[in-house]
Amino acid sequence: SMPGAPFLYYGDEIGMRYVENLHSVEGGYGRTGSRSPMQWDHSTNAGFSAAPKEKLYVKQDEATDRPTVEAQMADPDSLYHEIRKLIDIRQAHSALQSRGEIEFVYAEEKQYPLAYLRSDDKEKILVIINPADREVSFDGDCAVKEALYTFGGEATFAGGKVTVPGGSAGFYLL
């Protein structure tokens, strides 16, 4: 929801994990664990290659619960589908795109939440992110038309206060 071009490193969309203790290949400088092969399915080598495991250039996450593209696509509540929702919302709302303006509404040092307004000549969208494990509030008088997206609970807007559940995020059309 920030200005600029969004990006995902391969595997982010399915929640691929950092694989510990992988041998650095070609000067990976400790980042090799982030560069393991894509995990397509639960077949041999996660569908990446039919080669014997010892022939793989970089080893894979061998955990039985490793996320795969196949499993994520089949689960409507998966991270993959959550990211698809976010992409669709960004594409549908010009204020969230690269040319949308940004104005910070609440951004206090060592405090949550982070709240900012994304706007253009067509719309205004309030973005609120609260990674804290507790509910937080800030002063704000907002006339919300619609919650475009919420994760972890919806903020409430009453009496000049915005109250945000712990571990939540939301996009609110004003």
Residue ranges and their predicted role:
Residues 103, 135-139, 156, 161-163:
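Ser/Thr- (and often Asn-) enriched beta-sheet segments in non-cytosolic proteins
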Residues 45-46, 153-156, 169:
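A short acidic, often aromatic-flanked loop/helix-cap motif at beta-alpha or helix-coil junctions
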Residues 1-125, 131-136:
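Loop/helix patches that line or flank the sugar-binding groove of alpha-linked glycan CAZymes
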Residues 49-50, 151-152, 164:
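Short, surface-exposed secondary-structure junctions/capping segments
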Residues 135-153:
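Beta-strand-rich binding/interaction modules
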